[in-house]
């Protein structure tokens, strides 16, 4: 437990962002020409997108891109790089008959097929230790915010909030309270787009 409270790492989310900071991040993404992803609003911060001064060639459109995706993409062909535009438009998923999130690894409670389509075909995924899982709340999929441990959850002031979740039993709640970002048990933070509640997923290496 002491280790969890006293050690951090490069994944850390140090504190909640102010509205001004959120606006600056939106402006930076707009300057870079990044599309807006409802279910993954800060893909550069979470590491879903990487940046390269030299650029790489998008496998889908064949154009050089300085921002690219190398995360999970479930398709028959082995895809190395995808640009943000080909993900946002759905072209990458169409061209390769692929998806960025397994549609069997999602919370129940979302009945709108358009929302499912947006999540699995037009939203960059995230990399977990095991099979990535996407949380839902208020009849919609949540926004993915990044990797966290107990230290980050305390800094954000949401530790008690994420523990208030029928998903977790008492033993699992204790594990979350002692989790270390980047450790053997990894937590992934989500936020409801409608009521703002924070939710977790966790897995083991």
Task: Annotate each PLM feature.
Residues 7-205:
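Preference for intrinsically disordered or flexible, low-complexity segments
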């Amino acid at each position: 437990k002491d280790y969890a409270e006293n050690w951090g790492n490069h994944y850390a989310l140090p504190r909640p962002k102010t509205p001004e900071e959120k606006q600056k991040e939106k402006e930076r993404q707009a300057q870079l020409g990044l599309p807006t992803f409802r279910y993954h609003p800060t893909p550069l911060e979470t590491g879903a997108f990487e940046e390269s001064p030299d650029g790489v060639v998008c496998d889908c459109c064949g154009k050089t891109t300085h921002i690219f995706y190398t995360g999970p993409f479930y398709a028959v062909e082995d895809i190395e790089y995808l640009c943000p535009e080909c993900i946002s438009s759905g072209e990458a998923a169409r061209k390769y008959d692929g998806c960025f999130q397994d549609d069997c690894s999602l919370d129940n409670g979302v009945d709108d097929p358009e929302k499912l389509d947006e999540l699995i075909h037009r939203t960059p995924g995230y990399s977990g230790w095991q099979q990535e899982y996407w949380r839902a709340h208020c009849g919609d999929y949540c926004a993915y915010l990044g990797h966290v441990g107990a230290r980050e959850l305390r800094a954000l002031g949401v530790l008690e909030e994420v523990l208030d979740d029928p998903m977790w039993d008492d033993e699992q709640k204790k594990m979350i309270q002692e989790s270390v970002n980047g450790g053997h048990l990894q937590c992934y933070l989500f936020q409801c787009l409608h009521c703002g509640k924070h939710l977790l997923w966790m897995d083991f290496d």
